[in-house]
Swiss-Prot record:
This is Actin cytoskeleton-regulatory complex protein end3. CDD domains: EH. Component of the PAN1 actin cytoskeleton-regulatory complex. One of its GO terms (molecular function) is calcium ion binding. Belongs to the END3 family. It comes from Aspergillus fumigatus (strain ATCC MYA-4609 / CBS 101355 / FGSC A1100 / Af293) (Neosartorya fumigata).
């Protein structure tokens, strides 16, 4: 068993990169991620394979967890930890929230099947379409608690063992049996864990007013009938997406959450025994809790100061004297002071003194130097123009005096 994992400091570093590219969005598309991935100087063929591995849910975009996977693969390739892009994603790199997608994909690769068809049409009025096979982590944890509390010595669940749960649900008996038949195509007296989780997921959606699906994804059916999932790396393929994330709230406040009453009776709420393998991102700081990236914050502060200085300079320059003419002496003095201030900032940035001391990295220093340098050049140009104007005014004054 490999003891590798993505360390917390890596996750924080990847977050800074991800947040700067995503601009507040939860996912990166290929064009947004291309700049940072191509900086690795890996070949396009390698980067394509890395993208396919990291895009666990196969939606063509990378969320933060998938971006961490991609970055770790790239760094391992660049640093020589990997000689080539692996054919499948190593178990230690699989995000826990997507482990079921990978497992189902591996089962499908071992035994591809066609969808199971349910012939009976559900014409119950008032039910909604839009059933989603994706299991949110909170729902999956609840399903596993119910499974752990009712499984037999072989790790299987019988239909009758969940009767107390059925009684607590707002689901007709015919629909419960229809869902059971859907996950138990071989009509076995008991079903395994994967089938149980799918069965409870169907009941959960039916409890919330959604129609029971008429088909099962082939990847799920394979895991039901095989009774176990093949974890041989050489036999696996990239996972197939099950569906998008759904809403976590019940459609009506009059109904209890699926299984809550039942779990409360059992006294096992919050004691699920299942621990998925892979990278756990649960300790990662969420978006709203992350501090702004230090570089962006300090850059915005510098820009705000520059704008304030420019506005003050513009205001003073345009302020008329008592005789209606601009005070060029004052303007020249202020321009020289601002130039001196910017040159001092530039010198501090180059020497690593003053504010530049506070742990700024080389890239930020270079960016600040370029920015301040451009500002200094602009001020010098502005000062030269003002000097020309001043000289022209003095020349006009002398000419006027000479004519008198």
């Amino acid at each position: 068993m490999s003891n590798k994992k993505i360390e917390q400091w890596e996750i924080e570093r990847y977050w800074e990169i991800f947040s700067s590219l995503a601009n507040g969005h939860p996912r990166l598309n290929s064009s947004q991620a291309a700049s940072v991935l191509r900086n690795s100087r890996l070949s396009d063929d390698q980067l394509e394979k890395v993208w396919d591995l990291a895009d666990v849910d196969s939606d063509g975009e990378l969320d933060f967890e998938e971006f961490c996977v991609a970055m770790r693969l790239v760094f391992d390739l660049v640093n020589g930890e990997l000689q080539a892009v692996p054919r499948v994603l190593p178990d230690w790199l699989i995000p826990e929230t997507k482990a079921h997608l990978v497992q189902a994909g591996r089962a499908l690769s071992d035994r591809p099947e066609q969808f199971e068809r349910i012939e009976d049409e559900d014409d119950t009025p008032g039910l909604k379409d839009g059933f989603d096979w994706y299991m949110k982590p909170s729902d999956k944890s609840k399903y596993e608690e119910i499974y752990s509390a009712n499984r037999n010595h072989r790790g299987e669940i019988t239909f009758e063992s969940l009767q107390a749960l059925y009684d607590s649900l707002d689901v007709p008996d015919t629909d419960i049996r229809s869902a059971w038949n859907l996950v138990n195509p071989s009509a076995s007296p008991a079903i395994n864990k994967d089938a149980t989780l799918a069965f409870l997921h169907i009941l959960n959606y039916r409890h919330e007013g959604f129609r029971i699906p008429r088909t099962i994804p082939a990847s799920l059916r394979a895991s039901f009938e095989n009774n176990k999932i093949d974890y041989q790396i050489d036999n696996a393929r990239p996972a197939q997406r099950w569906g998008a994330d759904g809403d976590t709230e019940t459609p009506t406040g009059r109904k209890a959450k699926f299984g809550d009453t039942y779990l409360s009776r059992l006294g096992v709420g919050g004691k699920g025994s299942y621990t998925p393998k892979g990278t756990d991102f649960s300790d990662t700081i969420q978006d709203e809790e992350w501090e702004k990236v230090r570089l962006r914050r300090e850059l915005s502060e510098l820009q705000a100061k520059l704008e304030a200085a420019n506005k003050a300079s513009e205001s003073r320059r345009d302020r008329p004297r008592n005789d209606g003419r601009p005070n060029w002496t004052l303007i020249k003095k202020e321009a020289l002071q601002l130039l001196e201030y910017k040159e001092r900032e530039l010198r501090e940035l180059r020497e690593g003194t003053g504010r530049a001391k506070a742990g700024q990295d080389l890239e930020r220093l270079r960016e600040d130097i370029r920015t301040v340098g451009e500002q200094v050049e602009g001020l010098k140009s502005h000062l030269a123009q003002r000097k020309e104007v001043l000289a022209d005014l003095r020349s006009q004054i002398e000419e006027e005096r000479a004519r008198r």
